[in-house]
Every structure is written in structure tokens, then in C-alpha cells.
């Protein structure tokens, strides 16, 4: 399918709710119910061909085919490991998750937090799955991936060694939901090894679709404990960890039994009265299911004797289960980092869910068009995607006591874990926020962005999956500009914005339009010298054919030493004749050729003006302003298509491609306006009109059919028209 058709099809699906948790997209196009029914009818157990029980599913390096770590690994179904396997025993609990021989404690800490809210858990682990009723060796889980929910189908063959699960397992030996969830997550990311190393927030986000924020506990704001309580009340997921200074410290145990470089989940934050003083306590869980804090307020410590029995009864504080309490004052001293995942309104079932207003946008950094880099790249910075948000109401009850509008911004780049196997590194990403002075939602240009300082932004540019920050801004309109640190770095991203109050947000872009002056001339207006030259060139029929036109244009441009061209293509020459041929002869007469000549002169003038480095070609970023001067207002989406269609491997456009692009644009706008008689910005085409009146009609019909559901009539806006026809 054409990339543009894919985008338009996906956009239509989104409008119908596809990609939400209720309408999750089947991952790898595998439909759970269909596959399960097929297995039940055939009386076979499901074997997943897209994530086979083979070494490639384990990993590619340390868990690769020839690694000693994978020797003796056998894939077995739960019924081969115990006589009476169960999916979930007495409800999913955080004590069900114990780490195996995989460095994915970050993921297990997130799974543990997931069990604190059954409604959230069931969004990820659909109920009704078992090893008894309608068992077919197939299970499914729903996971959030870069802005949309996907339904991941797996078989229940799990990696084992010596009859025991190799990776995550339950303390209850016959329970398998956590091991199967880990397998689904491994499939989503390409392998088990792809899960090695990460932050708890990544798991939080992929289980909820929420947005995460990080706090350095050495710089904890004074209101952080209250913020933790509020976050837990709102169903947010919290994790914490202790930084390491070298790889030797990874998972080293301190004298007080805390594990360095290890992901913990925070499960509660409470206040109790101890000897007449109010003490703030935090409950933390180690996903190992053992190794607990031994300092003040640990299990059976003397501090528990100082509180009233009724307060003590509310807090579970004993048992070697990996969970323990500690004073908040010790928490911020012993731990280095706190991660909070704030949930989207649709995730929460309580009335408090409306606390957050949520906006989400998907975008791309395309080399040559929208990969402008950070502000250190003044020539290209303004070509980055831009988004405007309007903050109108201040917070009701600010935790920090300051008036203003709370805004959480998260910028996430896609597919980092999948790309690990190919040795690809994450981009270094960040964002800047500018005060918007109100210009009708049109992209801010260098006249604004290079003269104005950003008022906020990410603290740093960093090569992580996501960078997020919380801000307090006065009411007003702002522009958020996500970018890579370096220019010309390809990538896809999701930008998410949470606000405490309702806030309107939308992409900034240029309204698509064309202002090409029509030329009305008669034969008497043509200069006699030009007539003489035309008659010499045109021959006996006094008309220029497509072949003659190609020779003329190549001959003229070859004499221009300051522009580069590799010759006008036959396709471009046909487009020129299609645009200017008034009498249907498929040739150009004197007047038609004269109009073309004026266009070529204008295009040459524009081309030279915007070839700022005098290279004889135009860079893709120079193309943006050149097209505008030629009379076409285009947005980023159309410009991306143009660059991919007309630029060479170095993202440069020579003169013949420049002319071909402008001629094609003028022709497409002309066709669109012919159909759009009421000037609505939308046209209605039946199949006959598409195939007979549109250039490359059958191919265009094919793209339309991919992008939209097949009917006898297509409704197409100018953006869809240009993107599909140019691609």
C-alpha cells in the first residue's frame, strides 16, 4: 500500500475509534477470536508463526542462537510444566510477579503496579482466559504502542530450562498470566532480549497509554509527597530506583538491603501518627518478591509499636513478600529517581478521571522536509512540526501554591526496542515551547523563532524513548516544537499533552492554496521575434509536440551554466502539454508556447533566487520558500510527498524537477477547482470521473480505494487529493 494511502486510511480508522482500548488493532493482523475458533474446530493447539518457539524469539546477541545463555532452553506449554495450570489464581496480585534470568525488572515493576487496579489490569489482561474452558493454547493481551492500542496474540509455549520457566514466573508455581504477558510484550518488541534494560515508566505507559514524568529525589520539590498521594488517588502508577555509578554496581545490595540499578514499584503513600508526630510513609515493592529494606519502618521494626492499632491495621507491613514501608524522609535519601505515570481519562473509571485533559498528535521528522533539528540549526529549525495549545483556566488547587496552568508534555520516539537488533540508536530528542502571538494557526517562521527565546522546554535533549516535563505557565497560547538535536535525522514520534483544565490543541500548519495568475493573451500580443523563433522550431504544423518540447527545453536549459539539470523527462513534458493545451491537439500552439515560455522564465528566476549557496540545485528546505513564491501555499504533509517524489539522494532538486513539480501542482489545483464548483474545499468523484478525467486515473483510483472504503463515490479534500496524486 502507498504510504500516503496508509496514512489516510489510518486517519479514517482513528475517526471511527480504531486503536482505542475498546477497538484495539490486531497486531500482525492476527485476530484472536478467529484463530482460537479455528484451533477449536480442528482440535489443535495454536502455534504462532509470527513469534515461533525458536532461538530468534529469545534474542539476537546475549540470547542469540549460539549464546551459552540459551543452551538447554526448551519451549513448553504450562500443561507440560504442571498438572493443573491456572491463568490467574485468586486474582492478580503484585506478589505474582517474580523476576527470572532476564534484565527486565523495569517491566516487572510496572506489571506489579498494574495489579493495584483491577479495572486497569483488565484493559491489558482481558478476562475470560483459562487453561480449562475452550483451551486452545492461545492467549491475548492488549498493549499501548505509540498512540494506539494493539491486541497481541500469542501461543502458550514458554522458554524453560530444567522444567522451570526461564524468565518471569509467579511465586504460585501453577499461575501463568505474568509469564504470558511478558511473552506478549516480547513479541511486540521483537524478542525477549529486546526487553533488557529500561525504565519503569516505559512499562507504565505501554500498559496504560499514560504519560510519565521523572523526579530526581536529590532535588525533590517540597510538595512531592502530596503529589505522590494525589497521583496514587488518581490511579497513577509509580516506580523508583537507585542510580549506579558503574556496571559493577548493577543489582548490588546495600547494607540496608536495597538493590541498586533495580526497578521498584511504589504502591502507597500514607501518613500515620507516631509518638504524637505525623510521619509520612511510602510503601515499595521489589519485583524479586524478596530482599527488603531493613531500616526504620521495615517489617517488624520497632517503629510499628509507636502507632495506634487502628492505624496499624490499615497498613500491611509484615511477611517476606518483597514489599515494605519506609519513611518518606528515608525514601528521598536512599532512592535516586521517582517515576510517575499519569493516566488518560479513558483509563480511569472514577469521576476523578476528568482531572486530566488529554491531547495526542503523531508526526514525523522527514529528512529534507521536517527534520529541522534544534534551534542550533537556524536554517532548518522552523521546518520542524509545530503544535499550538491554548491555556485559558488556571488550576483550582495548585500543589505548589503558585497560580497558573499545569501542563505535562511528553515527546516519544517510536520503535527503539525493535531497532536494537539492527544496531540502530535512538535519536537525541527534545522540545521547545514558544509564546504564540496569534497568526491564524500558520507555522511560525524564522522571523519569529530566531528572534524570540523559548519560554519553556525539555531540560535537555536526550537519547531516550521519551522526554517529558511538567510546567506551570500563565494562561495564553503556546507553540510546542518537537525536534531531534541534530538536523536531517529521520524519525517518527508521538507528542502528548496533559493539562489540568480543558485546553484546545491542534497542529500548526499552512493552509493549502494556490495563487497562480492566469495569462490572457492573443496571437497579436506575441512579439514578432518570438513568432519567428517559434515557427522555426515548430515546423510545418506550427505546433510543438511532446518530443519537440523535450528537445527545446533541454537545449535551452543546457546553456544555463548556473543551474543543474539532467534533462526534462517525457513525463514532465506531457504534464506541460496537458496543462496548457487548450484545443485538445496534444500539442502547443504559438500562444500556448508563449505562456509556457513566460512560466519557464519566472521559474528560473525563482530557482536562482532560492539557490542560496549557488550550487545549481535547490535544497529541500530552500524548496519550501521557492514553492511559496511561485504561488503555492503547501503544508508539511504535501511538502514531504514532494521531496520524496522530486529530490535526489542528497535531498537536492535540480531545475527540471523544480519545473516538473510546479507544473504538476498547477495542473492538480486546476483539476480540483474544476470539480469543486461550490468552492467547498471538497470534491465528489465517481469511479468514471476518477478513471477518465484524472491523470493516471487507474492508479489514482487504486490509491483512493486503499485509503477509503470502496464505494461508487469518493469524497476527497484538497490535502488528500494532492498527497495521493503526487505520491
Which role does the model predict for each range below?
Residues 1-575, 582-594, 598-605, 609, ...:
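Structured alpha-helical subdomains that flank or immediately precede key functional sites
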Residues 612:
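Short, conserved catalytic or interaction motifs in soluble domains
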Residues 1, 706-709:
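Bacterial/eukaryotic Sec-type N-terminal signal peptides
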Residues 702, 710-711:
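Low-complexity, disordered terminal segments
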Residues 615, 622:
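A contiguous pocket-lining binding segment that forms or flanks enzyme active sites
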